[in-house]
Amino acid sequence: MAGHEVRYGKHRTRRSFSRIKEVLDLPNLIEIQTDSFQDFLDSGLKEVFEDVLPISNFTDTMELEFVGYEFKEPKYTLEEARIHDASYSAPIFVTFRLVNKETGEIKTQEVFFGDFPIMTEMGTFIINGGERIIVSQLVRSPGVYFNDKVDKNGKVGYGSTVIPNRGAWLELETDSKDIAYTRIDRTRKIPFTTLVRALGFSGDDEIVDIFGESDLVRNTIEKDIHKNPSDSRTDEALKEIYERLRPGEPKTADSSRSLLIARFFDARRYDLAAVGRYKVNKKLNIKTRLLNQIIAENLVDAETGEILVEAGTEMTRSVIESIEEHLDGDLNKFVYTPNDYAVVTEPVVLQKFKVVSPIDPDRVVTIVGNANPDDKVRALTPADILAEMSYFLNLAEGLGKVDDIDHLGNRRIRAVGELLANQFRIGLARMERNVRERMSVQDNDVLTPQQIINIRPVTAAVKEFFGSSQLSQFMDQHNPLSELSHKRRLSALGPGGLTRDRAGYEVRDVHYTHYGRMCPIETPEGPNIGLINNLSSFGHLNKYGFIQTPYRKVDRATGRVTNEIVWLTADEEDEYTVAQANSKLNEDGTFAEEIVMGRHQGNNQEFSASVVDFVDVSPKQVVAVATACIPFLENDDSNRALMGANMQRQAVPLIDPKAPYVGTGMEYQAAHDSGAAVIAQHNGKVVFSDAEKVEIRRQDGSLDVYHITKFRRSNSGTAYNQRTLVKVGDIVEKGDFIADGPSMENGEMALGQNPVVAYMTWEGYNFEDAVIMSERLVKEDVYTSVHLEEFESETRDTKLGPEEITREIPNVGEEALKDLDEMGIIRIGAEVKEGDILVGKVTPKGEKDLSAEERLLHAIFGDKSREVRDTSLRVPHGGDGIVRDVKIFTRANGDELQSGVNMLVRVYIAQKRKIKVGDKMAGRHGNKGVVSRIVPKGVVSRIVPVEDMPYLPDGTPVDIMLNPLGVPSRMNIGQVMELHLGMAARNLGIHIATPVFDGASSEDLWDTVREAGMDSDAKTVLYDGRTGEPFDNRVSVGVMYMIKLHHMVDDKLHARSVGPYSLVTQQPLGGKAQFGGQRFGEMEVWALEAYGASNVLQEILTYKSDDVTGRLKAYEAITKGKPIPKPGVPESFRVLVKELQSLGLDMRVLDEDDNEVELRDLDEGEDDDIMHVDDLEKAREKQAQETQEVSETTDEK
């Protein structure tokens, strides 16, 4: 027997074909959401408050300080928030201290700071009753970047940019004359030496001393001449910079100093953030700059005089490690003191080394490092600027390397916690201005924190983010896999990110650093391709937001692959050589072969086993969760695998789903972490279990109660239904499944079914990927799903009086009211068709001046005779089904309703949709198609069913027939392998796991096929169900996992006769949602013209479009059975005339005798009375009344 048994949870065992021993379990798949939000609550929020506060008034006599904050209990539970359309949020109370610096008086007070949405355990937020997800954003990391560019003459130039998290950009660039310039915040360029002089190093010799001799430095110094002898060089430089930043304003050295301090050196205005400081220090650190260079001077320990490294030594990694302590200490540190006119006058510490130029061995190049400022310094320092300039100048000497902006070491993730912190900071910054003004205006003695704090800007910023940000998205709730994928999504779009139109090919492309961090397969097709990605299965964020991936460490001394796990970011990985997970190992953990396949800085090649530093932990660490659910992924073309991964997320939850016979072993973990199942929180024993709740007694005697969700409407209109798995007496452990969610079976993801599939053509019905299906799948509800739609009706106060929910609806017969209760609301369980009343509602009509008789009737019969209009909620087209639930909200019951709304009724209708022609089906390999024919299953007698589908030698009919031509050109051979292995698994009565890149080999496949007693080619003879004759050739028949997708024909079918028209053009609206018509465009008109179908064309352009009076007349004629009158003038013709007149063209309409005709006269029919809309409505009401009277008299009889 090939393979080995593996248990997945307590309910499923699979035969696995994996050969690689995995030393690391998958992390919790939604930790990117939950951990980030927890960090925000624990420390992120505190940091934001500490960034903005304390706030002082303009005279610095009062100061508002932050003490701490606390979250109280949420107002609603999760379920209540869903029902009441409320947000699941907790009130936050912040303690402030107001200090009067003149009197020393301190007032401490707790201030309510609004309701803050709280993340659920599933990683989602409930906002206004809807479940939402904050998508993590992939952005360019703050830091310093270097790039090269080639001009039109082929000359290579260099550029550099310091990008902060918040603040002005500082750029450097070279031109064709080898002069180096700087730009501050995208303004006009100035020689870079001007900025150096402004920093207090004004002498030419001083500049050469810092940066060393180079053509770029000399050329720039010559360009940067002393223009005004009355100013010092530093003052002149400061004025020149001020002129660039504030052109037209009077320039002084002092104003320039304060401007530059605000731009770069003030931590409140300029923030690199922790990640920016880490990146700047890493890039400008002397150790990375010296690596592999030949040192041009003896390195001497200043204290002992010992020569650490002799001149001419190559600075390999081992040499640098041997003197690391000295490099981190004071080795070659120089202190430069700026002159008194400088922007910042503190001494500047730099680390300087001389190395041999890689281009010209006779030249010496100076390398300047920033001497590692403290991590807490968030603003730029003069040392950072000088070290950046040195790196930039060294690039022309062949030292250092330019950055790849698409490298994942330069792109980071802003997860939900950071996005919320940024939003909160925006709100607090708006509040700060407000607070400062109030502190200055009001009397200091009576001021309290409560009085000066207005929380509205903060709550508005948070509300706006959750409600309308591009990154706050309505959760994709088609099935648990789509929920999970949505939580792990990484978007490069959104505020501070890219835009679709400006994103080029490079940004979207797969990069070698994506390996183990971002999935190379799962991304949308269309305009967002490559901009929206998914986290790989083992991907994890470090504290700076860079994605790490785990590797097994290789002990270089013994050559053994250890079980020690090291998490590496993309730029850390660049320093090492990593072997693949499938490298063969001996028993003792050493490599079995001397040459192994590995990667180093994007090169995939063979390496000697002795140079390997790390080994992948798992073959599936490359791909995302949805991709890891595709068996035989290694046999599929990547384009089709992309479709397969995306289509699994569109699977509709079925009534009785089945887990796949051929899985990958990922189904259990995906279902477990998706948040759609009920998972045990503690160990214990089941003491009560039914369909709605499970009670578990813990070992310490306390009782846990788990509520099971039944048929709740999901975000995508499917039934969200959980099924209990445990029974009384079962012992459960923490993490066990208590109930399956939608699209799950026995604790595994189950998106579809396992039908018997044959690759063959049948009467041409499976042309172009169409799917032929047996009626058995319809009758036995194999692909039946339940869909829930929500309809609501509200009563408001109108100018003419309040609307009312009632059973007394004008002009409606008793038949239409049979399922309404005494209030006029449909009963639960009623079967409704389109047009049926769900909620009876009347709205008062404008009452005309009443005659004396009417007033008398009014006085006698009261409200009976008043004018009301029927505005009942009716079932829309395609909305028929069974009423599942009714919810009523009124002010009297204490429900929160919108202003002006008195009562709100919600009706939920459930539809059971069987599969039908036009529905879309798919496998897991991107093999999708539309059901084109459902082959009937007749019955000759009670005993012998007749099946037109082809059948196997044992009489089993085939369930689905697919077109064999869909396989070769698409290159997704995985489907054929799945087909054969699925048949073998069914025959053996087992389930199989074939993990991606480590699954069943072709030998395993054929061994299993033989074990199952199938023919050696895994094909079979098929018999024609209509004639009983065998087909000429043997056919590939097997079991394939097929899913029904959310693109159902019921949602797309649409027809219109009478409907709404656009207000301006008077043409019918478009689209199913607006109950619109079909657009008959220019080309369609040409087609009718070509056939000479003038009458058809005329009615399309008039009655059916925008001939307003014509269509009313036509309607009347049809209802009265009269001949249809001639059409009038379309509204669009009048628009054309008016537009031409507005251009000053004299356009008139003339009759045969050249007499001018008024356009409105054209509509006046010869003798026809025009029926206006009001008349039409009256006629309809009269007709309805007559119908009702007739039905009432019939009832009496």
Swiss-Prot record:
CDD domains reported for this sequence: RNA_pol_B_RPB2 (cd00653)
Organism superkingdom: Bacteria
Keywords, sorted A to Z: DNA-directed RNA polymerase, Nucleotidyltransferase, Transcription, Transferase
One GO-annotated biological process of the protein: DNA-templated transcription
Enzyme class: transferase
GO molecular function: DNA binding; DNA-directed RNA polymerase activity; ribonucleoside binding
One GO cellular component, as annotated: DNA-directed RNA polymerase complex
HAMAP family according to UniProt: RNApol_bact_RpoB
Family under the similarity heading: Belongs to the RNA polymerase beta chain family.
Protein name from the UniProt record: DNA-directed RNA polymerase subunit beta
